[in-house]
Amino acid sequence: MADTEKSLQSLDPIPVDVLFEIFLNLPAKFLARFVCVSKLWAKIIRNQDFIRSFSFRSFRENKQHRLLFAFKNQIKGYQENWYFFSKSTHVSTPLYEPNSLVLPDQNINKFEALVGEEPPDFESSTVCHLKKMRYQNPSYVHGLISFLYGEEQIICNPSIGKSINLPTLGSSETIIGSFLGYDPIHAQYKVLCLNKSSLQFCGHQVLTLGAQNCSWRMIQCPTPHYPGTTSVCIDGVLYYSASRGFTMHEPLNLVRFDLRTESLEIASVFPEDFKSSVKPSLINYRGKVAVFSKYFCGDFGLWVLEDAKKQQWSKEQRISIRRGVIGRLPQGLQILGTSDMGEVIFAPNYF
């Protein structure tokens, strides 16, 4: 036994560049485990060069674009169980036998009834044990999902079902908006948090995920404002709607936050003829920020910001959902964004 241990210790360690290549060809769920094996392995996997190479390899090899579905099941109090699924956006797959597949949540079986296809592939699940209610819809940016429950913020990786809790703000501060963004140049995720206290109308703090000093830092905002809709991140820039007054009844503005320079500015005022029966939705429309308005009876309007300096918006079109589809979805539809092909993605408000 002693001879065996000595022979193992005498073996030359695997070169770092070889480990780098080995890890590149492994699934993400194994890498999540390997960070606990040794400090060297964790250092390689968390290295920014490795993260960029792994992301590029995954994108290149994944020839089929996929949609991510998230379903929640509230157990008790404010505890939520989240289930994540993915589905190819290519040619529809054949119908399946309803009893041939068992899913974690019975509500998922309604997917087949809605679209007439087999349900998506199960990815992972995660449980959120929180003390307060979630007032903001989760946001999805470059593979990560952000949740906000009162003053508690959670970032989840749906590919592996792992999540982390972000550091809390001061006890006297109330979060009124939290937005997740991704900077593709430096391969960094950042969270922009808007809060109010007795000392200020609206403060702005930023946190960089994965930084050695993972703490909130204050940034300056030249124009005080109150956040409105959820955000959209395009090429390292976060956009969200806001009002310069205390309520969202004031004229709406489009706020721009550059993740690289961490600068905030009012990018534009919403179009004069913009009207909506619900809060507007911001999406990435062919590389430009766009806003959707919802009318009644399944009609939607789309405005695209063509030139922020000239305050130039173009109204692309008015989209009408077929009455037959609306009749099957009495709970209504919401706009989630667009696919890589520029297709607008709608989803039921509730399943």
UniProtKB/Swiss-Prot annotation:
Coiled coil: none annotated. Residues 8-54 form the F-box domain. It comes from the Eukaryota. SMART domains: FBOX. Pfam families: F-box, FBA_3. PANTHER family: BNAA05G37150D PROTEIN-RELATED, F-BOX ASSOCIATED UBIQUITINATION EFFECTOR FAMILY PROTEIN-RELATED. This is F-box protein At1g47810. It comes from Arabidopsis thaliana (Mouse-ear cress).
